[in-house]
């Protein structure tokens, strides 16, 4: 399938798309007459595959989104490709600009039903590059893996419903040009960085998340339309700049008590925190002179207050919130 869109006026736009059995591509250009700007872009996906399954009741999503879900609407779709490449070249008043983004095997899965909404994205072997020849800048970063997932309830129900979210980024590398912007003296280890976290929990929704009152009010407090029953930090990992931080925890909430912790239901549970390499990291920050000495000293004092040393530059802390709202760190009461 081949299609072309052209628009002319104060600006000229042309977009051409091609969809075939082996992949897909989109390319086009933009030229503004009022500003000396020209832009060309292209996005190509190889070995593109997609599939979808849906069940549609008599009431459509367009007619009544919430009622359609209640009546049994469901849809699942999957989208994969082996490689992709996006490139953008622009001529601006300040000089030329080039952007590129490439990925290896990638996939996107979505599902929608009365159970809620689910989305998962996975990308491997990705690389992002920005080139500004007029300034002599050529920035590049790449990562081995980047995946995210989210599942959330949508409809109001009397019983509890599950939610969850996860992010996994591994093998992140920065080019020397980009690294030198904040560490020109190479004081920090530049090993590949990684970050991972996963949360899950349960809630009771007194009002569906698809209601107009919620969608139109972006500043609405989530506790105004539901209750949080349980929250679990299943995993947290940050490994970068020579420091490794790991954490996990689990809490339950008493929605009849908003006074012990003003404005939120009273939590009860435990959490643990482990930090490796913090002293060496703070020493390097001090040598870089990016923070005032008072801030550095404050960070050391805070760590000494809530953490205990368990090995060579390893700190550990166990946190607890009891049923009376008392907060402890390693058995020492903080609140």
Question: Which ranges hold each PLM region?
Answer:
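Glycine-rich, small/hydroxylated-residue low-complexity segments
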Residues: 1-335
């Amino acid at each position: 399938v081949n299609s072309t869109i052209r628009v002319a006026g104060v600006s000229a736009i042309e977009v051409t798309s091609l969809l075939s059995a082996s992949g897909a591509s989109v390319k086009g250009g933009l030229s503004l007459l009022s500003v000396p700007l020209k832009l060309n872009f292209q996005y190509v996906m190889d070995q593109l595959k997609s599939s979808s399954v849906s069940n549609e009741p008599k009431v459509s999503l367009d007619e009544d989104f919430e009622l359609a879900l209640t009546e049994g609407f469901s849809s699942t779709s999957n989208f994969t490709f082996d490689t992709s490449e996006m490139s953008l070249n622009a001529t601006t008043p300040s000089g030329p600009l080039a952007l590129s983004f490439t990925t290896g095997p990638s996939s996107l899965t979505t599902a929608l039903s009365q159970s809620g909404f689910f989305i998962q994205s996975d990308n491997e072997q990705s690389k992002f590059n920005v080139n500004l020849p007029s300034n002599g800048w050529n920035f590049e970063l790449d990562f081995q893996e980047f995946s995210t997932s989210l599942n959330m309830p949508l409809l109001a129900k009397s019983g509890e419903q599950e939610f969850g979210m996860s992010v996994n980024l591994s093998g992140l590398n920065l080019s020397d040009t980009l690294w030198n912007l904040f560490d020109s003296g190479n004081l920090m280890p530049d090993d590949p960085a990684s970050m991972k976290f996963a949360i899950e929990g349960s809630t009771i929704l007194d009002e569906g998340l698809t209601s107009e009152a919620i969608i139109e009010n972006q500043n609405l407090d989530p506790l105004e339309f539901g209750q949080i029953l349980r929250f679990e930090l299943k995993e947290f990992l940050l490994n970068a700049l020579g420091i490794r931080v790991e954490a996990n925890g689990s809490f339950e909430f008493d929605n009849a008590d908003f006074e012990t912790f003003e404005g939120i239901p009273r939590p009860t549970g435990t959490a643990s925190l482990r930090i490796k390499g913090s002293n060496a990291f703070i020493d390097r920050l001090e040598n870089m002179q990016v923070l005032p000495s008072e801030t550095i000293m404050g960070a050391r004092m805070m760590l000494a207050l809530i953490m205990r040393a368990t090995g060579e530059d390893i700190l550990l802390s166990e946190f607890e919130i009891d049923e009376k709202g008392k907060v402890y760190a390693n058995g020492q009461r903080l609140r």
